């Protein structure tokens, strides 16, 4: 899939923008604070209905206005699709082909994106919540049912935690009802995650071995707070541990086990990647990003759109070459932001270059 056209009205520092793109590489050049990252954020938002930079939708609205409109014309294997998101003080409206979507799980996945931004380099050593978010964003695009089950899990989790905080003593019967619901949704969330990580590991290891010239292997491990064994279902084990932890959870006023506590670990040649070098971290994240692209295509039959936000300068020539070889080979539409072409020595011919200045975008008259 690829974005043929994007229109922004009152988004960040863009009062109005209408642009069309190459199905291959699109490079956005400009000084800092001109709107390059805002532009990629808009594509990300149109795909996932959320920003990767802020939780406050009001920050996305141009200072002179009270509403935001984003529309995109997306070419998929199955045909052209029009996406639209409107924001106002009344909330958010999402549309596919002018039809309002009642549920996010009906909208997300229509246009898949993979974002590679400087903050992704913190994925290995950052908080577990970053790694859970990484899993959730990918899985939500690949399997819309995952978002449905995760949303229901979080709703029941909020109810259970609220009860634990307010209760003066344990009502075993009431807690049993919440436990059953939490275990039911939570088990399916964990099953989806485990399957996803197993598939991602194979793709990531292939890319990592290519980047390291066969010197390093990359493995991933889903770290669950629920203790598993092969004889009993995840649901039964999760439910048992929830019941076992009633007193502890009541004392701590929160739920101590479940997918909201889970994590993801990375290993290079069997060693925890927390102890890897900076260069190895860059190779690991690059391998993951390329694996995301490969896996989305393998599981859905269509390519995602790749957003590279000021990260090419973080990669040496070898890593740049591996990345660009992948996107060209797989025919992935790619958006790159940069302050200069000087460090992009590996860019091929046939790219479209845009210049970004104070919320305006001008395309070069020629395709380079």
Swiss-Prot record:
Keyword set, alphabetical order: ATP-binding, Cytoplasm, DNA damage, DNA repair, DNA replication, DNA-binding, Nucleotide-binding, SOS response
GO cellular component terms listed in the entry, alphabetical order: cytoplasm
CDD domains from the UniProt entry: ABC_RecF
InterPro entries: DNA-binding_RecF, DNA-binding_RecF_CS, P-loop_NTPase, RecF/RecN/SMC_N, RecF_2
Residues that, per the record, bind ATP: 30-37
Membrane-crossing segments per the record: none
Domain of life: Bacteria
One GO BP annotation of this record: SOS response
Subcellular localization(s) per the UniProt record: Cytoplasm
Any GO molecular function: single-stranded DNA binding
SUPFAM superfamilies for this protein: P-loop containing nucleoside triphosphate hydrolases
PANTHER family: DNA REPLICATION AND REPAIR PROTEIN RECF
The protein's role, per its UniProt record: The RecF protein is involved in DNA metabolism; it is required for DNA replication and normal SOS inducibility. RecF binds preferentially to single-stranded, linear DNA. It also seems to bind ATP.
Protein family: Belongs to the RecF family.
Full protein name: DNA replication and repair protein RecF
Organism: Streptococcus pyogenes serotype M4 (strain MGAS10750)
Gene giving rise to this polypeptide: recF
